[in-house]
Amino acid sequence: MFQSQRLCGWIMNMNTDHETSDSGGSDEGDRRAELSTPAVGRLSLYYRELHRLLAAGESSTNSRDLGAMVNVSPAVVRRDLSSIGSIGRRGVGYDVAILAERIGAVLGSGVQWKAVLIGVGSLGNALLRYRGFERLGFSLAAAFDTDPAKYGHEVGGTTVRSLDDLEEVLATAKPELAILAVPSEQASQVATRVLAGGIQGILNFAPTTLRVPPGTAIINVDLASELQQLAFRIQNR
């Protein structure tokens, strides 16, 4: 959950950069600037659960039930939602459709993002098959690997290409984001290439901390380190 909150905060900040200069966009930008990264992460979780409620035909919910879905208290839910200008009605709660639309507007869910994935190993395969990206407005423009045996194969609807094609695809598809699922010894070189090709943000799953130019949007996700932190929390709860 902690990494997902960091990721959502990073995405929201990039969405703010994409905001238009009309008055409505300015209001949303002001609200985004006031939200903490943990609050943004929780809003994204509420958004996910609200869409599940909509799919199930539910029309209303309340802070107690919504909090139980994402493991936070009703008071935290009410505080988060009041911070984006959404106030529930006592005894009635929140209209699911209206609340989902409100949170989506704040998170910038209407912005469409294109990403490329480099490294189609076990983790890369799982990421390519994950359908949750599309719900939040992300599409995978291409996937790359250095193994010729994988070239031309389709994984989750995306065709795997040679890493030699990277610059060509970056120039034509113009994706904004890159997901790195490569070995640590390859990560720095790949990061340099994608940034030179116009990528604005990197989600790095390689077990190394990348050094990138100032102002570059990057999140380093080390799954082993996350497990260490989880073990620490269990030992010290």
Curated annotation (Swiss-Prot):
Recorded protein name is: Redox-sensing transcriptional repressor Rex
Quaternary structure? Homodimer.
Compartments it resides in:
Cytoplasm
Species for this entry: Rhodopirellula baltica (strain DSM 10527 / NCIMB 13988 / SH1)
Q: Which residues bind NAD(+)?
A: 119-124
Q: Which residues bind DNA?
A: 45-84
Q: Which gene encodes it?
A: rex
Against NCBIfam families, the record matches this protein to:
PRK05472.2-1 (NF003992), PRK05472.2-3 (NF003994), PRK05472.2-4 (NF003995), PRK05472.2-5 (NF003996)
SMART domains the record matches? CoA_binding
| Lineage of the species this protein comes from | Bacteria, Pseudomonadati, Planctomycetota, Planctomycetia, Pirellulales
Q: Which HAMAP family would you find in this protein's record?
A: Rex
Signal sequence segment: none
The answer on whether this UniProt entry bears the keyword Acetylation reads no
Output the superkingdom of the source species: Bacteria
Task: Provide a GO biological process annotation.
Answer: response to redox state
Q: Which GO molecular function, any one, fits this protein according to its record?
A: DNA-binding transcription factor activity
Q: Which UniProt keywords apply?
A: Cytoplasm, DNA-binding, NAD, Repressor, Transcription, Transcription regulation
Primary role: Modulates transcription in response to changes in cellular NADH/NAD(+) redox state.
Family classification: Belongs to the transcriptional regulatory Rex family.
